[in-house]
């Protein structure tokens, strides 16, 4: 099947199509992850983006569904050097070709992904159109240029839950005194493994839609407000920002990735868009308090402006060892903390899982 990838700067790349026949539009972003394509494709944070892997062979262990981070593929399309046609793993039920076809998502292979990655690093993230069943480069570029920027879309509405629902904590897992604590999780496109990490520590969870007002959240009587990961521009998540403002100082507040940016905005800081983002499982992060380096899994295109933290009560706890961007903050006086990286991994290293989720348990009065 013919396929073409067109970028807004006029770049045209032809290759071989796989998955579904059709057109995908979005920002072209790259990840340096070697494995974890099941997790990445089903991560709601990739909504509105065409995902490209720098690693040359993707799909070699097939698709099992055990590691999905949501029920469906959220990336708009997939760009790879080679998509494995005959995967092997004892749990695999289908190939990545079949997976994309089943989900109605197009893919393109036979592409020089390293060249495209270098271009993204030099020129920044660009809009793109991936068309399968055609090799009309002029049309692909036209579609890419006419597609609205990701910051103009309300992507959160497409991935948040539609109504509140309760998830009891794992039985007998709570190590603190008294009954298990209750966290309200503002779902902006939450990954399944974040839920799993809170659940297995015995914390009762109520997931609420992104548009839930502070008064409604208060009705659930939470012991903790948790802000999830999600897609797009954090400044668009106004209801979540207002929720943090309402509960900061009254109960503990924590967040991951998109949630980290929202917490920082709510406290008075600023965010900005990175040139090409951080995506992959090999991002080095420094803990400025413990003076330690660890490797983290990341997926974000925005960051918190370190200079804007002055006067907010927040301080930088974690810093990216590559480009010195903010990777996590804590409040000087309140139980408010967040990280830009993904301590729950899936996929990626789990160096910081216990550090982050252990702190969640601790601020709720539990035992580590």
UniProtKB/Swiss-Prot annotation:
Keywords: Amino-acid biosynthesis, Arginine biosynthesis, ATP-binding, Glutamine amidotransferase, Ligase, Nucleotide-binding, Pyrimidine biosynthesis. L-glutamine binds at residues 45, 230, 232, 258, 261, 299, 301-302. It catalyses: hydrogencarbonate + L-glutamine + 2 ATP + H2O = carbamoyl phosphate + L-glutamate + 2 ADP + phosphate + 2 H(+). Pathway: Amino-acid biosynthesis; L-arginine biosynthesis; carbamoyl phosphate from bicarbonate: step 1/1; Pyrimidine metabolism; UMP biosynthesis via de novo pathway; (S)-dihydroorotate from bicarbonate: step 1/3. Residues 1-178 are annotated as: CPSase. The keyword Thylakoid does not apply. Its EC number is 6.3.5.5. It is an enzyme of class 6 (ligase). CDD domains: GATase1_CPSase. One of its GO terms (biological process) is 'de novo' UMP biosynthetic process. The keyword Nucleotide-binding applies. PROSITE patterns: GATASE_TYPE_1. Residues 182-368 form the Glutamine amidotransferase type-1 domain. GO terms for molecular function: ATP binding; carbamoyl-phosphate synthase (glutamine-hydrolyzing) activity; glutaminase activity. GO terms for cellular component: carbamoyl-phosphate synthase complex; cytoplasm. The active site is at residues 257, 342, 344. Belongs to the CarA family. Small subunit of the glutamine-dependent carbamoyl phosphate synthetase (CPSase). CPSase catalyzes the formation of carbamoyl phosphate from the ammonia moiety of glutamine, carbonate, and phosphate donated by ATP, constituting the first step of 2 biosynthetic pathways, one leading to arginine and/or urea and the other to pyrimidine nucleotides. The small subunit (glutamine amidotransferase) binds and cleaves glutamine to supply the large subunit with the substrate ammonia. Composed of two chains; the small (or glutamine) chain promotes the hydrolysis of glutamine to ammonia, which is used by the large (or ammonia) chain to synthesize carbamoyl phosphate. Tetramer of heterodimers (alpha,beta)4. This is Carbamoyl phosphate synthase small chain. It comes from Methanosarcina acetivorans (strain ATCC 35395 / DSM 2834 / JCM 12185 / C2A). The lineage of its organism: Archaea, Methanobacteriati, Methanobacteriota, Stenosarchaea group, Methanomicrobia. The gene is carA.
């Amino acid at each position: 099947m013919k396929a073409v990838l067109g970028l807004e700067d006029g770049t045209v790349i032809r290759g071989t199509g796989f998955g579904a026949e059709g057109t995908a539009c979005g920002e072209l972003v790259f990840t340096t992850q070697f494995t974890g394509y099941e997790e990445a494709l089903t991560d709601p944070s990739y909504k509105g983006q065409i995902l490209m892997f720098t690693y040359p062979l993707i799909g070699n262990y097939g698709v099992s569904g055990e590691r999905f981070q949501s029920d469906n593929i959220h990336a708009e399309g997939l760009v790879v050097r080679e998509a494995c046609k005959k995967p092997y793993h004892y749990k695999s039920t289908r190939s990545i070709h079949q997976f994309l076809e089943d989900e109605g998502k197009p893919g393109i292979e036979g592409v020089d992904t390293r060249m495209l990655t270098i271009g993204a690093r030099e020129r920044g993230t660009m809009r793109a159109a991936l068309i399968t069943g055609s090799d009309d480069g002029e049309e692909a570029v036209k579609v890419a240029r006419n597609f609205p920027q990701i910051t103009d879309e309300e992507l959160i509405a497409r991935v948040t839950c539609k109504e509140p629902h309760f998830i009891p904590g794992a039985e007998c897992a709570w190590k603190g005194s008294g009954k298990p604590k209750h966290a309200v999780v503002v779902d902006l496109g939450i990954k399944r493994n974040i839920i799993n990490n809170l659940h297995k520590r015995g914390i009762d969870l109520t997931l609420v839609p992104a548009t839930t007002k502070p008064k409604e959240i208060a009705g659930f009587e939470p012991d903790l407000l948790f802000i999830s990961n999600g897609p797009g521009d954090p400044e668009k998540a106004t209801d979540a920002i207002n929720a943090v403002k309402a509960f900061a100082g009254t109960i503990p507040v924590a967040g991951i990735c998109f949630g980290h940016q929202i917490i920082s905005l709510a406290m008075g800081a600023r965010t900005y868009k990175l040139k090409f983002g951080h995506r992959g499982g090999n991002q080095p992060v420094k803990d400025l308090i413990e003076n330690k380096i660890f490797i983290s899994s990341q997926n974000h295109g925005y960051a918190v402006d370190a200079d804007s933290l002055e006067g907010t009560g927040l301080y930088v706890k974690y810093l990216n060892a590559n480009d010195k961007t903010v990777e996590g903050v804590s409040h000087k006086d309140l139980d408010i903390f967040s990280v830009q990286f993904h301590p729950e991994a899936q996929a990626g290293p789990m160096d910081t899982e216990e550090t982050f989720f252990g702190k969640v348990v601790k601020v709720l009065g539990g035992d580590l």
